[in-house]
Amino acid sequence: AASDVYKRQQVPMSTWSGIRNKLESDYLCPALRGHIQYFATSYSKSADHEGRAAIRMDGVEVLRSNYYTYFENVWTKFTQLRSTTMKDCDSTKEAINLSHAHALEQGTFDQKVFYEAFGIFDNQSIENSLVSENPLVRIFALLDRRLGKRRLLALEESMEQELDWVRAFYVTRMQAEGLMDRE
């Protein structure tokens, strides 16, 4: 269910430099090494040290979001759900989970959601990551060295149903592997 996308995962928290090193060195496919960089930060003067996260391609942020954009999307969806279909108190938690899932599907997240997605990815198989309900986990899987060319080609049909911003990483990987022309 869509509401399961945002369920908080209890995973051991690593340092950001450790997470980045694993993503860029251990997991990233050789064809994209030096081209893809992961970025996350929290701002010490911000309430609760909120921050932002991004994935860069050759120094350009191709996917980025921050706490404030993420929270605005969550709150907008939550108030819409509470004013229409989920008015009773029993459905508040479901409305919150659906709101977080909706915001993530829209491509908005904060650094904490980014870290949680990595924790999920790092603690499950590539097969489970490719079909994860969390789109960030699917991106990590699409860029993973364990995903071979045959398997990448086999994903083509399922990518037609994928979120646009996730599909863009599939195209990037296909081009890097020489399986698709650069347009």
Which role does the model predict for each range below?
Residues 7-183:
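Alpha-helical scaffold segments
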